[in-house]
């Protein structure tokens, strides 16, 4: 059966209740923390060494197919609790601000309190039972997404800090300009790809490591949602905040929209073996069960409501 992923704004109260219940249940069973640990591991220096240096989940062409498989695995875990549950998405181009229903006390909970920025409301507050068991913070001044260096974070509570590090969530114009790009990715297949005309890296613009010359700052789209939310969403342990999955569901939807807009171009690059990055036929670790080619058609697994 192919499920439909919805904008959280169109979900019924019962659908939201079921989703939250399933998330809490896989957390109780220890399954949720495995997803947090995996997301940390795939960007660590240790994992990069084991995988012969190939980056799989971030800052490379594999960003989109790797997270597509990751979300599928997470969604399947939820569906073992409740087969009716599907992942919702957060369309941050129109759904702005901390007064959004996204942050209600019965769904994601709200912003962190002043001072330590601890989340105090909703099902994912520490005082309501949501304990962080695996968390890291950056080590050293360089962007850890580039060097893979992290150290232990001993806070066992979820932290958010809305709008402090960037005041703005993505705009419809930002997304449209990125969706208009016709090349999936380009050499050198990293955080610098597509940063100059003709801007040939849809992946890197969507991931947020590059920008158009007329845009004011780096960190747009995917990156902006992480940075605007702040707190634990800033680090590679970001799945500790369940809103991570709504953000990445939106990113996956953007890839699907881009594919539909450009049916006649390669939907993944590189197509041939390439040093340091996964090509079209590289089995994606740690599962090694699917390649980017296997994941191009999302309608085999689910559809989006729009």
Swiss-Prot record:
Cofactor binding summary note: Binds 2 copper ions per subunit.
Q: Please list the GO biological process terms of this entry.
A: antibiotic biosynthetic process
Q: Which UniProt keywords apply?
A: Antibiotic biosynthesis, Copper, Metal-binding, Oxidoreductase
Enzyme class, spelled out:
oxidoreductase
Which InterPro entries does the record associate with it?
Answer: Di-copper_centre_dom_sf, Tyrosinase/Hemocyanin, Tyrosinase_Cu-bd
Select a single GO molecular function from the record's annotations and give it: o-aminophenol oxidase activity
Phenotype upon knockout is: Cells lacking griE and griF show accumulation of the 3-amino-4-hydroxybenzaldehyde (3,4-AHBAL) intermediate.
Name the catalysed reactions: 2 3-amino-4-hydroxybenzoate + N-acetyl-L-cysteine + 2 O2 + H(+) = grixazone B + CO2 + 4 H2O; 2 3-amino-4-hydroxybenzaldehyde + N-acetyl-L-cysteine + 2 O2 = grixazone A + formate + 3 H2O + H(+); 4 2-aminophenol + 3 O2 = 2 2-aminophenoxazin-3-one + 6 H2O
Which cofactors?
Cu(2+)
Activation/inhibition comment: Inhibited by 3-amino-4-hydroxybenzensulfonic acid, 4-hydroxy-3-nitrobenzaldehyde, L-tyrosine, p-hydroxybenzaldehyde. Activated by the copper chaperone GriE.
Provide the residue positions that the database annotates as binding Cu(2+) B: 222, 226, 248
Q: How does activity depend on pH?
A: Optimum pH is between 8.5 and 10.5.
Detail the relationship between temperature and activity. Answer: Optimum temperature is 55 degrees Celsius.
Determine if Oxidoreductase is one of this entry's keywords: yes
- Glycoprotein listed as a keyword: no
Recorded hits in SUPFAM superfamilies, A to Z, give: Di-copper centre-containing domain
**Entry binding sites for Cu(2+) A:** 39, 58, 67
The EC number(s) attached to this protein equal: 1.10.3.15, 1.10.3.4
Q: What is this protein's function per UniProt? A: Involved in the biosynthesis of the parasiticide antibiotic grixazone. Catalyzes the oxidation of 3-amino-4-hydroxybenzoate (3,4-AHBOA) to yield the corresponding quinone imine which is then non-enzymatically conjugated with the thiol group of N-acetylcysteine. The resultant compound is oxidized to its quinone imine enzymatically and is then dimerized non-enzymatically with another quinone imine oxidized by GriF to yield grixazone B. 3-amino-4-hydroxybenzaldehyde (3,4-AHBAL) can also be used as substrate to yield grixazone A.
Q: Which family does it belong to?
A: Belongs to the tyrosinase family.
Protein name (database record): Grixazone synthase
């Amino acid at each position: 059966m192919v499920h439909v992923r919805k904008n959280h704004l169109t979900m019924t109260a019962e659908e939201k209740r079921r989703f939250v219940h399933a998330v809490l249940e896989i957390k109780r069973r220890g399954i949720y923390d495995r997803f947090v640990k995996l997301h940390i591991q795939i960007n660590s220096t240790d994992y990069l060494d084991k995988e012969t240096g190939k980056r799989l989940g971030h800052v490379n062409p594999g960003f989109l197919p790797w997270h597509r498989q990751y979300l599928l695995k997470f969604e399947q875990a939820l569906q073992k609790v409740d087969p009716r549950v599907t992942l919702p998405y957060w369309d941050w181009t129109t759904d702005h601000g901390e007064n959004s229903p996204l942050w209600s006390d019965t769904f994601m909970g709200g912003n962190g309190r002043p001072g330590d920025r601890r989340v105090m409301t909703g099902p994912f507050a520490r005082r309501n039972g949501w304990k962080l068991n695996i968390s890291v913070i950056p080590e050293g001044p360089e962007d850890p997404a580039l060097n893979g260096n992290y150290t232990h974070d001993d806070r066992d509570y979820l932290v958010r800090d809305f709008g402090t590090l960037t005041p703005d969530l993505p705009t419809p114009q930002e997304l449209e300009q990125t969706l208009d790009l016709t090349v999936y990715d380009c050499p050198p297949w990293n955080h610098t790809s597509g940063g100059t005309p003709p801007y040939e890296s849809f992946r890197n613009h969507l991931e947020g490591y590059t920008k158009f010359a007329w845009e004011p700052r780096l960190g747009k789209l995917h990156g902006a949602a992480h940075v605007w939310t702040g707190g634990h969403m800033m680090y590679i342990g970001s799945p500790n905040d369940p809103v991570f999955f709504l953000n990445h569901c939106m990113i996956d939807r953007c890839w699907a929209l881009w594919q539909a807009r450009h049916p006649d171009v390669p939907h993944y690059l590189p197509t041939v073996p390439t040093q340091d990055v996964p090509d079209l036929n590289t089995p994606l670790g740690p599962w090694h069960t699917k390649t980017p080619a296997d994941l191009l058609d999302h309608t085999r697994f689910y559809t989006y409501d729009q």
